[in-house]
């Protein structure tokens, strides 16, 4: 597979500055073209060994990996009060650059920095950056990322315990260019008290029998509405479950193909909105968060692994931990959630660690990857402490078969369900345009759901949006 060109790397992020566009077309100086000659990863592999740098620059979009690093990387010595830096035992200073994900902000700033990587001072070069599943291929299929085996030095044996899909999604032509501490299968998290009221049971096995396909799921939505509840919070909640079960990638060549399964999401969401089965919220807005808390009347939420411990738990509390609240039964609806498989297997998100071409900290990067993504004991401890689902099959199977219980989930061992779901994840239809096209598709149809435009107008708005964002994509094909 031919790697993404410098110009298409920029186009895939949806933004091309005038200067960058000129450089991409050959109008820039040689110092500004990070990938103008041989692939950076190849250069890194053939370069003589150099002394390790004393500054490790890590770029990410929130503090999740920062927390994992500071709490579980054995070489951490001290953490600055403002958490802007972490000092390692060998004296290396880890500098954290955190740019929020909203409106492509993280990718835009990361892209600019990577394009200037060659000309940056050694202590300013990016060493590690984090990527998500939705846009992983944009980066790993470029010359800005190091091969974790050939360039960084991990071995097949080091990586053997990880879920295969977590390696496949960051691999191009056999070259693995990232690694992760987490696997992210999805489940359906529901309110126990609401399930009891609507279905007469809160038992996960029994609840699953009512939600095992979309027809049954829709039947429960009607029953929930009759009891005064919403089945889902908003427009976006079920989207991943549909988009992860498409029959082909979004883009082939320069043609965008809208999968039939996405139109099933449109039909269901329109029906739920018209019938009052949702609260018309959008993912991450205040209504959506509130619906997960003590005053919420929503039956459930589609969440993957990180969502349980990183988002849902926090939203369930009446008194946030930042205000002195404790993660315990009695604080809000802590303990009132449970999880089941839901109507279809899916995944949501996941964060991969990438080594940046041009880094002078390859040994440190290797050690970070080894300890935080390959060490079975550390992976198991992260799960035991945080309820996150980590990327080690043996460790997760041990917990799944143990007497482990989540107090937040009313004593349920949710790791057992995640372990079963993780083996069903299929990343074969992932592509570099996924994030932008998924967001544009969801945004275009919100006006249709609320009755502001007809369906044909929503389709036209989607086509306009993606042609503005990705001018190299020339055609859009809709299901017959």
Give, region by region, the residue ranges found by the protein language model.
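Conserved N-terminal structural module of periplasmic/extracytoplasmic solute-binding proteins
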Residues: 3-5, 10-137, 156, 380, ...
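Hinge/lid segment of periplasmic solute-binding proteins
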Residues: 40-47, 118, 131-187, 324-339
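Periplasmic-binding protein-like
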Residues: 68, 192, 370-398
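Extracytoplasmic/periplasmic substrate-binding proteins
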Residues: 70, 74-75, 264-367
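A local structural motif
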Residues: 83-102, 121, 202-207, 270-284, ...
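Short helix-initiation/N-cap motifs at beta->coil->alpha
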Residues: 99-112, 212-216, 280-292
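Helix-loop-helix "hinge/cap" segment bordering the ligand-binding cleft or interdomain interface
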Residues: 151-158, 168-238, 250-283, 357-363, ...
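Long, aromatic- and glycine/proline-rich binding clefts that accommodate carbohydrate-like moieties
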Residues: 331-335, 383-443, 447, 475-480
